[in-house]
Amino acid sequence: MNQYQRVAFYTLGCKLNFSETSTISRLFEDGGFAKVDFEEHPDVFVINTCSVTENADKKCKQLVKRAKKISPESMVIILGCYAQLKPEEIAQMPGVDLVLGANEKFNVLEHLEQKRSEIEQHHSNPAALEKATIVHDNIKHTHDFIPSHSYGDRTRSFLKVQDGCDYFCTFCTIPLARGKSRNASIDQTVIEAKKIAATAVKEVVLTGVNIGDFGQGGQENFFELTKALDKIEGIDRFRISSIEPNLLSNEIIDFCLTSANRFAPHFHIPLQSGSDEILEKMRRKYRSELFANRIAQIKSINPDACIGVDVIVGFPGETDDNFLETMHFLKDLDVSYLHVFTYSERANTGAPKLGTKVPMEVRRERSKQLHLLSDRKKQAFYQTQIGKTKKVLFEQEENEGFLYGFTENYVKVKTPFSAELINQIVDIQITEIDRDGLAKCLILANFAEI
């Protein structure tokens, strides 16, 4: 019988990490482990890390302390981007037993078994095992694409279609943490999606580091992938998680908004700055004019399409004028919400050398202003949806007697709780926006008849 019977997982960061954690958790379950919550005194903790910001690093350290407080005799395994970038730093954390780099995270069971053998061999000399075991290789040696998808954790599933990035933006460590851009073939990706179609999942979110780079300029590309996925029976919705504006072609936009049967009218597009001067310093592959054209193209086809935007404040050398340029650019854009990131210095990136360091209090103030703008944008978009008929996928989230879900164009809707509505796509009419900024709705059709 396996010495370690219960395993808990914690995922930091992006949807891609969630898809990989879910796949790794199934490896554990196939190996005889019971998956439990973090607080249920597991024998093994697996923490899948992010390293986009300094806060993500700090969160990992906090989780290790929390894990050892919950189960002092447990094994703590760290994997993910932080583990690839700074394995020695993690290994110095009290309580960490195993640190796995990018090439080894899907071999976690083998490394756990090896670690267990070492513990048994040195049980009379605990000092020999005080330092964590590191299994790590240079990211240049990471070439394989490992398919992943999430299942059982949420109403929707995250399907990994691409990994790595060749862009090397000056603020970003992801190419150092995940390696070169790579993917499976379209046929292999369709096979993975059909595994999800065989379950009760209604919505699949396509995820990766730079999904628009699918195919890396070869015979296959992201547009061809969307057309192939759209033909899969058994999945009601596909949603694109995030796509670079220079890779979001007009043919992708046209297909998703006019021809596709299953792709949601929702795009999340990273801008990062509305200042062309800052975009150049960031080594972004577009300028503000192209970004504005993409937004205009989407809205000209479907005014109800939801558009989310990533933006970074406090990039080195960002002046007040640069920030105001971003503010004014975003105010004039017909977008639905913003994801605002406060710039965080990252080791081995070029950004810190490109300009004067922006004081943290200035970064926070700029972030606050953009969050307020995002709230106004979202509220304005939601108001345009009142009276319209949409389809909502209700999720397993219950709070104070309400059930929540999202329309195809990503409006968050609430309705009085009914267990029968969970994981059902239901025709509704949006009736009002409440004080919490959520849409109330009228159920138009009995879900059992849909």
Regions found by a protein language model. Give the residues of each.
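Proteins enriched for Cys/Gly/acidic motifs involved in redox and nucleic-acid/cofactor modification
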Residues: 1-213, 227, 251, 267, ...
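Hydrophobic, well-ordered secondary-structure elements that form the walls
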Residues: 269, 310, 330, 338, ...
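Contiguous mid-protein beta-loop-alpha structural module that forms a pocket-lining wall or clamp
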Residues: 318, 334-335
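Terminal RNA-binding accessory module
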Residues: 353-450
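Conserved SAM/AdoMet-binding glycine-rich loop
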Residues: 76-77, 85-86, 198-320
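A structural micro-motif
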Residues: 33-34, 74, 97, 235-236, ...
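Short, solvent-exposed loop/turn segments at secondary-structure boundaries
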Residues: 56-58, 180-187, 215-220, 281-284, ...
